[in-house]
A protein has these predicted regions:
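Glycine- and aromatic-enriched mobile tails/lids
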Residues: 2-195
């Protein structure tokens, strides 16, 4: 229980709220393991969702909204559709374009980085300091390319933002793996440089 472990072990409150007031986390966002199972993530997400609703009900104040901020956020959210519309006619295949990247290609790149450098299945769940640092270098390239995400539909627009969120989560995960040098339960990941 909570009283049996040092305070540093607990990253947030008991209701899955992070250290940012009103921001709740579940699944991969709550631990250093890239192999959280969907059943546990589902249960954790349900719990975090219920706690978020309780927090909202207890802290229900109307914010002051600046319409210019809303307009800027709307433009940012819809940018992948504008990128596709602006550049889609320059190639014969809309999936291949030097001016944008479609969500599926972005997802494949992200998965490849995490699988090969963050202790995924293709690396036999092994990683090391050098592998993690290389993964972070490749993640920087992916972040640069994230501004070129393009969407042909509302479904792809959702996939673009899902990829951006996954990219930031993956970056945090790589940073966590780099910081925590111990092996985490053989089968989850193995630090070959500090076994």
């Amino acid at each position: 229980g909570k009283g049996e472990l040092p305070d540093d072990y607990f990253w947030g409150d008991a209701g899955n709220m992070t250290t940012i007031n009103g921001l709740f986390a579940a699944g991969d966002a709550t631990g250093a393991s890239s192999h959280k199972f969907s059943s546990g993530s589902h249960a954790e997400g349900r719990f975090a969702g219920k706690q978020a609703v309780k927090w909202i009900m207890a802290n229900n104040t109307m914010p002051e909204v600046n319409q210019a901020d809303v307009d800027a956020l709307t433009e940012m959210v819809l940018k992948p559709m504008a990128v596709f519309e602006e550049h889609s006619g320059i190639t014969s295949d809309p999936d291949i374009n030097p001016n944008y990247i479609i969500p599926q290609q972005f997802m494949f790149r992200l998965q490849k980085i995490m699988d090969e450098y963050a202790g995924g299945v293709s690396a036999a769940f092994k990683t090391s300091d050098n592998m993690l640092k290389r993964g972070l270098e490749l993640m920087d390239f992916l972040k640069e390319d994230s501004v070129k995400l393009a969407a042909r539909s509302l479904n792809e627009l959702e996939r673009c933002w899902e990829n951006i969120h996954r990219m930031w989560q993956a970056d945090a995960h790589l940073q966590t793996l780099l910081f925590r040098t111990e092996t985490r339960w053989p089968g989850y990941y193995f630090r070959s440089d500090t076994p």
